[in-house]
Curated annotation (Swiss-Prot):
Keywords: ATP-binding, Coenzyme A biosynthesis, Cytoplasm, Kinase, Nucleotide-binding, Transferase. Belongs to the prokaryotic pantothenate kinase family. This is Pantothenate kinase. Pathway: Cofactor biosynthesis; coenzyme A biosynthesis; CoA from (R)-pantothenate: step 1/5. The gene is coaA. SUPFAM superfamilies: P-loop containing nucleoside triphosphate hydrolases (SSF52540). The lineage of its organism: Bacteria, Pseudomonadati, Pseudomonadota, Gammaproteobacteria, Enterobacterales. It comes from Serratia proteamaculans (strain 568). It catalyses: (R)-pantothenate + ATP = (R)-4'-phosphopantothenate + ADP + H(+).
């Protein structure tokens, strides 16, 4: 049974893990264990069971929504007597740093690509629309990286607007976590996919976040279905620190890495720095700008230890 809170009206239906898993309804798992290992993040435990119980039901739900949207487009074309343009279905994925947004996005890209109705699924992260480090330094915003003011929101909104307008070819800038900066001339080309997955901290922001400029257009205005990946902050901080330590042993050891100096730190000092980065930047951004957007999502998936999703809330 779906949980219904009798004492408090809510716009969401709530499912525990078992209830949600039952909604898979015989959808086959088309990914192998080796493929799943390639898709998961550096700090996540992702099992075949997790994919089958959580992400297959989600891909089934999204397939229903996307098919419904295609039928609506066909009705409009019939009414207008036109062939119409191919308009991608945009899925937004939001949540804190270290919560596993990228893994969720990559998994959905792989699963949705396997549905026969829509094979073309593109994935874009909003990191590419951060201002280059040169600009952030000039504006004194390097310690606000990931905050709303650190993004080129005009370019991001323009990109999503062009995609939803049916433009045949749209380019998006690419971000490198190795150099901690936007890649010069590293654009990714998007050519009318069936589905565009847009993953980032800020995809659910709206005019409510900018009362001084309520008439601004936002990314969320162009998103058809949005997912917020949630977890308690103490888990998020722990995941962030563990990820930092793994990067210190791996990616940071690359001489080209922006954080190469961190690879030489003793572990206690590395933990202190990661904790400081969380408290002064990522945790602050979560509380001020990311968490307040959670209840705007079409679906909220809440994680417990080991990145296992323990419940799902679906907007009615």
């Amino acid at each position: 049974m779906i949980k219904r809170d009798q004492s408090l009206a809510t716009p969401y239906l709530q499912f525990d893990r078992t209830q949600w898993a039952a909604l898979r309804d015989s959808v086959p798992l088309t990914l192998s264990e080796e493929e799943i290992v390639k898709l998961k993040g550096i700090n996540e435990d992702l099992s075949l069971e997790e994919v089958a119980q959580i992400y297959l039901p989600l891909s089934r739900l999204l397939n229903f929504y996307i098919s419904s949207n295609l039928r609506r487009q066909a009705v409009l074309e019939q009414f207008l007597g036109t062939d119409g343009q191919k308009i991608p279905y945009v899925i937004g994925i939001a949540g804190s740093v270290a919560v596993g947004k990228s893994t969720t996005a990559r998994l959905l890209q792989a699963l949705l690509s396997s549905w026969p109705e829509h094979r073309s699924v593109e994935l874009i992260t909003t990191d590419g629309f951060l201002h280059p480090n040169k600009v952030l330094n000039e504006r004194g915003l390097m310690k606000k990286k990931g905050f709303p003011q650190s993004y080129d929101m005009h370019s991001l909104v323009k990109f999503v607007s062009e995609v939803k307008s049916g433009a045949k070819r749209v380019t998006a800038p690419v971000y490198s976590h190795l150099i901690y900066d936007v890649v010069p001339e590293g654009n990714k080309v998007i050519e009318q996919p069936d589905i565009l997955i847009l993953e980032g901290l800020n995809v659910l922001q709206s005019g409510m976040d900018y009362p001084h400029d309520p008439h601004r257009v936002f990314v969320s205005d162009f998103v058809d279905f949005s997912i917020y990946v949630d977890a308690p902050e103490e888990l998020l901080q722990s995941w962030y620190i563990n990820r930092f330590l793994k990067f210190r042993q791996g990616a940071f050891s690359n001489p080209d890495s922006y954080f190469h100096n961190y690879s030489k730190l003793p572990e206690p000092e590395a933990i202190n720095i990661a904790s400081q980065l969380w408290n002064e930047i990522n945790g602050l951004n979560l509380q001020e700008n990311i968490l307040p957007t959670r209840e705007r999502a079409s679906l909220i998936m809440t994680k417990s230890a080991n990145h296992a999703v323990e419940n799902v809330r679906l907007r009615k």
